Amino acid sequence: MTPTLRRKLEALAERREELQHLLSDPEVVSNNDKFRSLSRELSQLEPVALAMQEEARAKADLSAAEAMRNDPEMRELAEEEILAAQARLDELDAQLALLLVPRDPRDEGNLFLEVRAGTGGDEAAIFAGDLFRMYARYAERQGWKVEIESDSPGEHGGYKEVVARVVGRGAYSRLKFESGTHRVQRVPATESQGRIHTSAATVAIIPEADDVEEIVINPADLKVDTFRSSGAGGQHVNKTESAIRITHVPSGVVVECQTERSQHANRDKAMKRLKAQLVEAERSKAAAAEAQTRKLQVGSGDRSQRIRTYSFPQGRITDHRVEGLTLYDLPNIIEGDLDALIARLLHEHQADELARLSEGT
Protein backbone atom coordinates (compact mmCIF):
# COMPACT_ATOMS: atom_id res chain seq x y z
CA MET A 1 0.00 0.00 0.00
CA THR A 2 1.31 3.44 -0.91
CA PRO A 3 2.06 6.01 1.82
CA THR A 4 -0.77 8.18 0.44
CA LEU A 5 -3.32 5.39 0.90
CA ARG A 6 -1.96 4.62 4.37
CA ARG A 7 -2.41 8.25 5.41
CA LYS A 8 -5.99 8.16 4.17
CA LEU A 9 -6.65 5.06 6.29
CA GLU A 10 -5.22 6.76 9.36
CA ALA A 11 -7.43 9.78 8.70
CA LEU A 12 -10.50 7.51 8.55
CA ALA A 13 -9.51 5.90 11.87
CA GLU A 14 -9.26 9.36 13.45
CA ARG A 15 -12.62 10.34 11.98
CA ARG A 16 -14.20 7.20 13.47
CA GLU A 17 -12.98 8.16 16.95
CA GLU A 18 -14.29 11.68 16.43
CA LEU A 19 -17.71 10.35 15.39
CA GLN A 20 -17.91 8.11 18.46
CA HIS A 21 -17.33 11.15 20.69
CA LEU A 22 -19.84 13.27 18.75
CA LEU A 23 -22.56 10.63 19.02
CA SER A 24 -22.29 10.73 22.81
CA ASP A 25 -22.75 14.51 22.83
CA PRO A 26 -26.21 15.39 24.26
CA GLU A 27 -26.57 18.21 21.74
CA VAL A 28 -26.10 15.78 18.84
CA VAL A 29 -28.32 13.12 20.44
CA SER A 30 -31.17 15.64 20.68
CA ASN A 31 -30.87 16.52 16.97
CA ASN A 32 -32.46 13.58 15.13
CA ASP A 33 -31.26 14.54 11.65
CA LYS A 34 -27.65 15.13 12.74
CA PHE A 35 -27.60 12.00 14.89
CA ARG A 36 -28.92 9.90 11.99
CA SER A 37 -26.42 11.41 9.54
CA LEU A 38 -23.41 10.85 11.84
CA SER A 39 -24.59 7.33 12.72
CA ARG A 40 -24.77 6.49 9.02
CA GLU A 41 -21.24 7.82 8.50
CA LEU A 42 -19.95 5.80 11.46
CA SER A 43 -21.55 2.59 10.18
CA GLN A 44 -19.83 3.11 6.82
CA LEU A 45 -16.45 3.31 8.59
CA GLU A 46 -16.95 0.10 10.60
CA PRO A 47 -15.66 -2.26 7.86
CA VAL A 48 -12.46 -0.17 7.66
CA ALA A 49 -12.02 -0.29 11.44
CA LEU A 50 -12.54 -4.06 11.56
CA ALA A 51 -10.05 -4.64 8.74
CA MET A 52 -7.46 -2.40 10.44
CA GLN A 53 -7.90 -4.32 13.72
CA GLU A 54 -7.42 -7.58 11.83
CA GLU A 55 -4.31 -6.11 10.18
CA ALA A 56 -2.88 -5.20 13.61
CA ARG A 57 -3.42 -8.79 14.80
CA ALA A 58 -1.75 -10.18 11.67
CA LYS A 59 1.26 -7.88 12.21
CA ALA A 60 1.51 -9.06 15.83
CA ASP A 61 1.38 -12.69 14.65
CA LEU A 62 4.15 -11.96 12.14
CA SER A 63 6.38 -10.37 14.79
CA ALA A 64 5.85 -13.31 17.14
CA ALA A 65 6.66 -15.82 14.40
CA GLU A 66 9.83 -13.92 13.42
CA ALA A 67 10.94 -13.98 17.05
CA MET A 68 10.44 -17.77 17.17
CA ARG A 69 12.64 -18.22 14.12
CA ASN A 70 15.72 -17.70 16.28
CA ASP A 71 14.91 -20.92 18.16
CA PRO A 72 16.29 -23.89 16.14
CA GLU A 73 13.57 -26.18 17.48
CA MET A 74 10.80 -23.78 16.47
CA ARG A 75 12.27 -22.58 13.18
CA GLU A 76 10.24 -24.83 10.87
CA LEU A 77 6.96 -23.96 12.58
CA ALA A 78 7.95 -20.28 12.63
CA GLU A 79 8.57 -20.27 8.88
CA GLU A 80 5.08 -21.67 8.27
CA GLU A 81 3.49 -19.06 10.52
CA ILE A 82 5.49 -16.27 8.87
CA LEU A 83 4.22 -17.31 5.43
CA ALA A 84 0.63 -17.50 6.71
CA ALA A 85 0.86 -14.08 8.39
CA GLN A 86 2.39 -12.47 5.31
CA ALA A 87 -0.32 -13.95 3.08
CA ARG A 88 -2.99 -12.64 5.45
CA LEU A 89 -1.38 -9.18 5.47
CA ASP A 90 -1.32 -9.11 1.66
CA GLU A 91 -5.00 -10.06 1.61
CA LEU A 92 -5.87 -7.35 4.15
CA ASP A 93 -3.80 -4.79 2.26
CA ALA A 94 -5.92 -5.35 -0.87
CA GLN A 95 -9.13 -5.36 1.19
CA LEU A 96 -8.26 -2.06 2.90
CA ALA A 97 -7.37 -0.45 -0.42
CA LEU A 98 -10.80 -1.34 -1.83
CA LEU A 99 -12.49 0.00 1.31
CA LEU A 100 -10.86 3.35 0.55
CA VAL A 101 -12.71 3.66 -2.74
CA PRO A 102 -15.30 6.41 -2.16
CA ARG A 103 -18.75 4.94 -1.72
CA ASP A 104 -21.45 6.49 -3.85
CA PRO A 105 -24.32 7.30 -1.46
CA ARG A 106 -26.77 6.60 -4.30
CA ASP A 107 -25.58 3.01 -4.82
CA GLU A 108 -28.24 1.34 -2.69
CA GLY A 109 -31.09 3.34 -4.21
CA ASN A 110 -33.60 3.00 -7.02
CA LEU A 111 -33.20 4.41 -10.52
CA PHE A 112 -34.96 5.51 -13.67
CA LEU A 113 -34.06 3.57 -16.82
CA GLU A 114 -34.53 5.33 -20.15
CA VAL A 115 -33.98 3.50 -23.45
CA ARG A 116 -34.40 5.33 -26.77
CA ALA A 117 -34.02 4.13 -30.34
CA GLY A 118 -31.22 5.89 -32.20
CA THR A 119 -30.08 5.61 -35.80
CA GLY A 120 -31.37 2.63 -37.73
CA GLY A 121 -35.12 3.06 -38.13
CA ASP A 122 -37.30 0.06 -37.27
CA GLU A 123 -34.27 -2.07 -36.36
CA ALA A 124 -33.15 0.56 -33.83
CA ALA A 125 -36.57 0.40 -32.15
CA ILE A 126 -36.42 -3.40 -32.07
CA PHE A 127 -32.93 -3.22 -30.53
CA ALA A 128 -34.15 -0.69 -27.95
CA GLY A 129 -36.81 -3.24 -27.02
CA ASP A 130 -34.15 -5.96 -26.74
CA LEU A 131 -32.07 -3.77 -24.41
CA PHE A 132 -35.05 -2.94 -22.21
CA ARG A 133 -35.96 -6.62 -22.01
CA MET A 134 -32.33 -7.45 -21.12
CA TYR A 135 -32.38 -5.03 -18.19
CA ALA A 136 -35.86 -6.16 -17.11
CA ARG A 137 -34.71 -9.80 -17.10
CA TYR A 138 -31.61 -8.86 -15.10
CA ALA A 139 -33.76 -6.93 -12.62
CA GLU A 140 -36.02 -9.97 -12.26
CA ARG A 141 -32.99 -12.14 -11.44
CA GLN A 142 -31.98 -9.65 -8.75
CA GLY A 143 -35.46 -9.59 -7.25
CA TRP A 144 -36.04 -5.96 -8.25
CA LYS A 145 -39.28 -4.44 -9.46
CA VAL A 146 -39.59 -2.73 -12.86
CA GLU A 147 -42.39 -0.18 -13.29
CA ILE A 148 -42.91 1.24 -16.79
CA GLU A 149 -43.62 4.97 -16.55
CA SER A 150 -44.09 5.77 -20.24
CA ASP A 151 -43.45 4.11 -23.57
CA SER A 152 -43.74 4.71 -27.29
CA PRO A 153 -43.84 1.38 -29.19
CA GLY A 154 -42.07 0.95 -32.51
CA GLU A 155 -44.11 0.24 -35.64
CA HIS A 156 -42.54 -3.22 -36.08
CA GLY A 157 -41.86 -4.04 -32.44
CA GLY A 158 -39.63 -2.76 -29.70
CA TYR A 159 -39.73 0.84 -28.54
CA LYS A 160 -39.03 4.25 -29.95
CA GLU A 161 -38.70 5.19 -26.28
CA VAL A 162 -39.39 3.51 -22.95
CA VAL A 163 -38.92 4.86 -19.43
CA ALA A 164 -39.14 2.68 -16.33
CA ARG A 165 -38.46 2.93 -12.61
CA VAL A 166 -36.30 0.12 -11.23
CA VAL A 167 -36.90 -0.49 -7.53
CA GLY A 168 -34.55 -2.65 -5.49
CA ARG A 169 -31.64 -2.54 -3.10
CA GLY A 170 -28.37 -1.90 -4.91
CA ALA A 171 -30.05 -1.31 -8.28
CA TYR A 172 -28.09 1.85 -9.06
CA SER A 173 -24.75 0.34 -8.00
CA ARG A 174 -25.17 -2.47 -10.54
CA LEU A 175 -26.56 -0.54 -13.50
CA LYS A 176 -24.94 2.89 -13.22
CA PHE A 177 -22.32 2.07 -15.86
CA GLU A 178 -24.93 1.36 -18.57
CA SER A 179 -25.52 4.98 -19.65
CA GLY A 180 -24.39 5.67 -23.20
CA THR A 181 -24.89 4.60 -26.80
CA HIS A 182 -25.24 0.86 -27.46
CA ARG A 183 -24.62 -0.30 -31.03
CA VAL A 184 -25.87 -3.52 -32.61
CA GLN A 185 -24.63 -5.39 -35.70
CA ARG A 186 -26.97 -8.08 -37.03
CA VAL A 187 -29.26 -9.13 -39.87
CA PRO A 188 -32.67 -7.56 -39.13
CA ALA A 189 -35.77 -9.75 -39.29
CA THR A 190 -37.05 -7.39 -42.00
CA GLU A 191 -33.90 -7.81 -44.16
CA SER A 192 -34.60 -10.11 -47.13
CA GLN A 193 -31.07 -10.03 -48.59
CA GLY A 194 -29.32 -11.27 -45.45
CA ARG A 195 -27.22 -8.13 -45.09
CA ILE A 196 -25.82 -7.07 -41.72
CA HIS A 197 -27.13 -3.71 -40.52
CA THR A 198 -25.76 -1.44 -37.82
CA SER A 199 -28.14 0.51 -35.61
CA ALA A 200 -28.05 2.05 -32.16
CA ALA A 201 -30.01 2.88 -29.03
CA THR A 202 -29.18 5.12 -26.11
CA VAL A 203 -29.51 4.23 -22.44
CA ALA A 204 -29.71 6.64 -19.52
CA ILE A 205 -29.50 5.52 -15.89
CA ILE A 206 -30.71 8.23 -13.53
CA PRO A 207 -30.63 7.66 -9.75
CA GLU A 208 -33.85 8.44 -7.96
CA ALA A 209 -33.43 11.54 -5.81
CA ASP A 210 -33.97 10.89 -2.11
CA ASP A 211 -35.42 13.20 0.52
CA VAL A 212 -31.98 14.56 1.43
CA GLU A 213 -31.52 15.71 -2.16
CA GLU A 214 -34.92 17.40 -2.33
CA ILE A 215 -34.75 20.42 -4.58
CA VAL A 216 -37.08 23.37 -4.81
CA ILE A 217 -38.90 23.71 -8.14
CA ASN A 218 -40.73 26.92 -8.88
CA PRO A 219 -44.24 26.03 -10.15
CA ALA A 220 -43.98 29.01 -12.53
CA ASP A 221 -41.11 27.19 -14.29
CA LEU A 222 -43.35 24.24 -15.19
CA LYS A 223 -45.51 23.72 -18.26
CA VAL A 224 -48.01 20.92 -17.62
CA ASP A 225 -49.89 19.20 -20.46
CA THR A 226 -52.46 16.43 -20.23
CA PHE A 227 -53.25 13.90 -22.93
CA ARG A 228 -54.95 10.57 -23.46
CA SER A 229 -52.81 7.66 -22.44
CA SER A 230 -51.76 5.01 -24.93
CA GLY A 231 -50.38 2.77 -22.19
CA ALA A 232 -51.78 0.02 -20.00
CA GLY A 233 -54.90 0.41 -17.91
CA GLY A 234 -57.76 -0.78 -20.09
CA GLN A 235 -60.31 1.36 -21.87
CA HIS A 236 -60.44 3.97 -19.08
CA VAL A 237 -57.10 5.53 -19.98
CA ASN A 238 -58.21 6.24 -23.52
CA LYS A 239 -61.40 8.01 -22.43
CA THR A 240 -59.85 10.54 -20.05
CA GLU A 241 -56.80 12.76 -20.31
CA SER A 242 -55.04 11.09 -17.38
CA ALA A 243 -51.52 11.12 -18.85
CA ILE A 244 -49.20 13.96 -17.84
CA ARG A 245 -46.34 15.70 -19.61
CA ILE A 246 -44.30 18.19 -17.56
CA THR A 247 -41.73 20.54 -19.10
CA HIS A 248 -39.21 22.32 -16.87
CA VAL A 249 -38.86 25.45 -18.99
CA PRO A 250 -35.46 26.75 -17.71
CA SER A 251 -33.67 23.44 -18.36
CA GLY A 252 -35.80 22.05 -21.18
CA VAL A 253 -36.22 18.73 -19.34
CA VAL A 254 -39.45 16.94 -20.33
CA VAL A 255 -40.97 14.00 -18.45
CA GLU A 256 -44.12 11.98 -19.07
CA CYS A 257 -46.14 9.45 -17.14
CA GLN A 258 -49.18 7.59 -18.44
CA THR A 259 -49.27 4.31 -16.52
CA GLU A 260 -51.62 5.27 -13.67
CA ARG A 261 -55.40 5.56 -13.94
CA SER A 262 -55.57 8.99 -12.32
CA GLN A 263 -54.05 12.25 -13.47
CA HIS A 264 -52.95 12.99 -9.89
CA ALA A 265 -50.98 9.73 -9.61
CA ASN A 266 -49.33 10.29 -12.98
CA ARG A 267 -48.37 13.83 -11.96
CA ASP A 268 -46.77 12.58 -8.72
CA LYS A 269 -44.70 10.05 -10.64
CA ALA A 270 -43.71 12.58 -13.29
CA MET A 271 -42.59 15.09 -10.64
CA LYS A 272 -40.46 12.43 -8.98
CA ARG A 273 -38.70 11.77 -12.28
CA LEU A 274 -38.29 15.47 -12.96
CA LYS A 275 -36.57 16.01 -9.61
CA ALA A 276 -34.26 13.07 -10.28
CA GLN A 277 -33.39 14.47 -13.72
CA LEU A 278 -32.61 17.93 -12.35
CA VAL A 279 -30.46 16.57 -9.49
CA GLU A 280 -28.57 14.37 -11.96
CA ALA A 281 -28.05 17.31 -14.32
CA GLU A 282 -26.29 19.20 -11.53
CA ARG A 283 -24.15 16.16 -10.77
CA SER A 284 -23.27 15.77 -14.44
CA LYS A 285 -21.98 19.35 -14.53
CA ALA A 286 -19.75 18.65 -11.53
CA ALA A 287 -18.57 15.36 -13.07
CA ALA A 288 -17.75 17.11 -16.35
CA ALA A 289 -15.61 19.64 -14.49
CA GLU A 290 -13.83 16.84 -12.63
CA ALA A 291 -13.25 14.92 -15.85
CA GLN A 292 -11.16 17.81 -17.12
CA THR A 293 -8.53 16.99 -14.50
CA ARG A 294 -8.56 13.19 -14.72
CA LYS A 295 -9.51 10.43 -17.12
CA LEU A 296 -12.76 8.66 -16.32
CA GLN A 297 -12.71 5.26 -18.00
CA VAL A 298 -16.03 4.02 -16.69
CA GLY A 299 -19.20 5.63 -15.45
CA SER A 300 -19.14 9.09 -16.98
CA GLY A 301 -22.88 8.73 -17.57
CA ASP A 302 -22.71 10.52 -20.92
CA ARG A 303 -25.50 9.04 -23.04
CA SER A 304 -23.79 10.29 -26.23
CA GLN A 305 -20.68 8.20 -25.52
CA ARG A 306 -20.54 4.95 -27.51
CA ILE A 307 -19.91 2.38 -24.83
CA ARG A 308 -20.71 -1.04 -26.27
CA THR A 309 -21.18 -3.05 -29.46
CA TYR A 310 -23.35 -6.17 -29.72
CA SER A 311 -22.20 -8.25 -32.70
CA PHE A 312 -24.75 -11.00 -33.30
CA PRO A 313 -22.93 -12.72 -36.21
CA GLN A 314 -19.88 -13.25 -33.97
CA GLY A 315 -21.84 -13.77 -30.76
CA ARG A 316 -19.74 -11.20 -28.92
CA ILE A 317 -20.14 -8.06 -26.86
CA THR A 318 -17.34 -5.48 -26.70
CA ASP A 319 -17.27 -2.69 -24.13
CA HIS A 320 -15.19 0.13 -25.61
CA ARG A 321 -14.39 1.81 -22.27
CA VAL A 322 -12.25 -1.04 -20.97
CA GLU A 323 -9.30 -2.37 -22.96
CA GLY A 324 -9.77 -6.03 -23.81
CA LEU A 325 -13.32 -6.30 -22.47
CA THR A 326 -14.91 -8.62 -25.02
CA LEU A 327 -17.24 -11.44 -23.99
CA TYR A 328 -18.32 -14.22 -26.37
CA ASP A 329 -21.58 -14.88 -24.55
CA LEU A 330 -24.04 -12.59 -26.32
CA PRO A 331 -27.05 -14.98 -26.32
CA ASN A 332 -27.00 -15.28 -22.52
CA ILE A 333 -26.15 -11.62 -21.89
CA ILE A 334 -29.01 -10.34 -24.05
CA GLU A 335 -31.30 -12.58 -21.97
CA GLY A 336 -30.26 -10.73 -18.82
CA ASP A 337 -27.16 -12.61 -17.64
CA LEU A 338 -25.15 -9.44 -16.96
CA ASP A 339 -23.20 -10.49 -13.87
CA ALA A 340 -19.85 -11.15 -15.58
CA LEU A 341 -20.01 -7.91 -17.56
CA ILE A 342 -21.00 -5.80 -14.56
CA ALA A 343 -18.28 -7.41 -12.41
CA ARG A 344 -15.61 -6.38 -14.94
CA LEU A 345 -16.91 -2.81 -15.04
CA LEU A 346 -17.00 -2.57 -11.24
CA HIS A 347 -13.44 -3.90 -11.03
CA GLU A 348 -12.25 -1.37 -13.60
CA HIS A 349 -13.99 1.44 -11.75
CA GLN A 350 -12.37 0.42 -8.46
CA ALA A 351 -8.92 0.21 -10.07
CA ASP A 352 -9.44 3.65 -11.61
CA GLU A 353 -10.45 5.14 -8.25
CA LEU A 354 -7.52 3.50 -6.43
CA ALA A 355 -5.08 4.90 -8.98
CA ARG A 356 -6.56 8.34 -8.43
CA LEU A 357 -6.34 7.99 -4.64
CA SER A 358 -2.72 6.82 -4.86
CA GLU A 359 -1.88 9.94 -6.84
CA GLY A 360 -3.45 12.01 -4.07
CA THR A 361 -5.94 13.72 -6.44
UniProtKB/Swiss-Prot annotation:
Keywords: Cytoplasm, Methylation, Protein biosynthesis. GO terms for molecular function: translation release factor activity, codon specific. The modification N5-methylglutamine is found at Q235. GO terms for cellular component: cytoplasm. It is found in: Cytoplasm. Methylated by PrmC. Methylation increases the termination efficiency of RF1. Pfam families: PCRF, RF-1. The keyword Cytoplasm applies. InterPro entries: PCRF, Pep_chain_release_fac_I, Pep_chain_release_fac_I_sf, Prokaryotic/Mito_RF, RF-1. The keyword Acyltransferase does not apply. Belongs to the prokaryotic/mitochondrial release factor family. Peptide chain release factor 1 directs the termination of translation in response to the peptide chain termination codons UAG and UAA. This is Peptide chain release factor 1.
